[in-house]
Amino acid sequence: MKILFANVSLPVASRGKIPISILLFFSCFISVKAQEKQQDSTQLKVLDEVLVQAVRVNATSPITHSNVDKEALEKRNLGQDIPILLNYLPSVVTTTDVGAGVGYTGIRIRGINAQSTNVTINGIPYNDAESLGTFWVNLGDFASSVESLQLQRGVGTSTNGSGAFGASVNILTDAVSEKANAEISNSFGSFNTRKHTLKFSTGKLNDHVEIAGRLSQIKSDGYIDRAASNLKSYFLQASYVDDKTLIKALTFSGKEVTYQSWNGLEDLDLLKNDRTYNTAGMYTDANGETQFYDNEVDNYQQDHYQLHWNQRYNNNWSTNVGLNYTKGKGYFEQYKEDEAFADYGLEDVVMGGETISETDLIRRRWLDNDYYVANLGVNYKNDTWNIDFGTSYGYYDGAHFGEIIWAQYASNSEIRHHYYDGNGKKTDFNVFGKATYRLNSQWSLYGDLQVRFVGYKTTGLSSDRIPFNVDENYTFFNPKAGVSYNLNSNNNFYFSYARANREPNRDDFENNQTVKPEQLNDFELGWRHLQETFRFNVNAYYMLYNEQLVLTGNIDGVGNPVRTNSGKSYRLGLEVEAAVAITDQFSVQPNFTLSTNKNKETIVSQDGALTNLGKTNISFSPSFVAANALVYSPINGLQVSLLSKYVGEQYMGNTDSEKSKLDSYFVSDLNVSYELIFSQDNESKPFVKSILLTGLVNNLFNEKYISNGYYYTYDDTWTDPNQVTTIEGAGYYPQATTNFLIGATLKF
């Protein structure tokens, strides 16, 4: 009966019988007939979890968190990206450029954007080192290779990489399987969406070695015109395991080709009458007719290679060593009209005595980067102490360059003329120690100290051909502390404090060379209540910022959000989540977040003069977000869920302008899953162990809503030379109306 409402799934009778075919894919495959196998599988689980133990917390930790396992992901995994699968967790708002959850998607947690959310995979940082963003489009169908994930709200525990600045997502990939198994999964749906997945595991060969893998392709035409996606990916791992050792060598890769849709819609008439209209690739031909360039695409591939060695020495000591290499390379391609030769370092063209200073052209902007990471973790645990020491070093080397692949007038360019070249190098070293001390059966204390050293240097030209030279070094000290109190077996109370510091990203420096690092002091106070048929979590948070890099609402030429320091700001909120088993077959799982998110003082330029707007709302931070799941399980294997989401109104800028407001919306999805399980008890075991049928109707009530957009201003100095007038503009990303996905998975 699990839905993606983590930490609140209920132990009702309908969950008591978990199919063997599902358990084959769990990290701790358990044979119900063999106690020895059960012990082996438990050891496997413990060894696998060492991969993420340094960055995760347990159920009674004073850190606000949600856990999601493979079973919960499986019921909705029909091709949509991981952010969409997490949409119903507390304080989460998801967005998608193409409107249907395939391609470029995003997630905000407590209003905190992707650049401030730390993502790790097996303890290895996944955020892009320069932009600090997370590009889920490069991990097509990665949910099919996830064993579990933990979403921490607030600063959370010390982690590797750029660090959490308000939220973190820690992912553990597929665990070692005891027995050989395989899956074939296919799904189809609206907008010509289809997903094809093949998975396998050899099981443990000679009781020690397992090889497992996945091959996937997802294709979709998208809800927005021409916003097609073609995502190919694989996951492959080889593992060696014995009683105290787990060694994993794994590689996963994703290649995405997506037609661009990051322009959104600014024309309100189009938004009303033709909300799927896409301006990307638009140009005017020689006959004055509007055309669309057919290869206005984003084309990028990312390859990951990881090696992990987990070692348990006894019941107290364990270590983890992790190595990573990531190779990323790709470009986005654009047709551009009437571009000045001078903007590309080219000379004007003279033809028949006429000087031509502009041309239509097709350009590509490239990224070619290498990322290396080394992690080391040591854990000591006894009945009183749980202590972790960890260190991580990351090195990033990224080339940025642009090339012209076609021009109406070639000027003095060469084939694939580079019109800018730049480079960014970043080092990231951190060391941390964290400990939980159990005073007695009721009280426990938590402490966490981290020091992080960051160096960032750029050379060459920006994409606008402006010299771009940054040489910055930062030292950050991030202390954390907390206390947890178990009143009894049903009630747990906690309080925590955490500080986070974070460096600006590449885009921040391009927009403002004097940008400052940001700092967050996070206070969390919570109560967890647990009964057999009722669970209830309440958490209050106060996040106090200094120089928070808030989204201005504007985007750059490739759809990346523009940020700026906001001085003093804060987020104050209350999160409530619950789960109630009405009967053995029916449950309700609601959650909501009520918050106020404010810049303490906002000064802007309006109509040529500086204006103090005083206290304003932080952009993209709705004051009310709620979700609910009505779950009905009439028979074993069948689950019907009505999932609902409400997001209150929000501002896309920090000026409280009506022009920047996004309306509230309420949407519901209907999810049905049925697993037909074939008996494995008789001698003639069937070849197919089970068939899982899944259906999903998104936006059941056909709401025409907008979950994301952008807002900008500029000064009009030409209409009246004696007056400056500030002009406002906004663009919107319409989301899909009612659509569906259906799928079938055969498990062998």
Predicted stretch roles:
Residues 441, 542-544, 564-655:
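Gram-negative outer-membrane beta-barrel transporters
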Residues 588, 646-651, 674-748:
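C-terminal beta-signal and adjacent terminal beta-strands/loops
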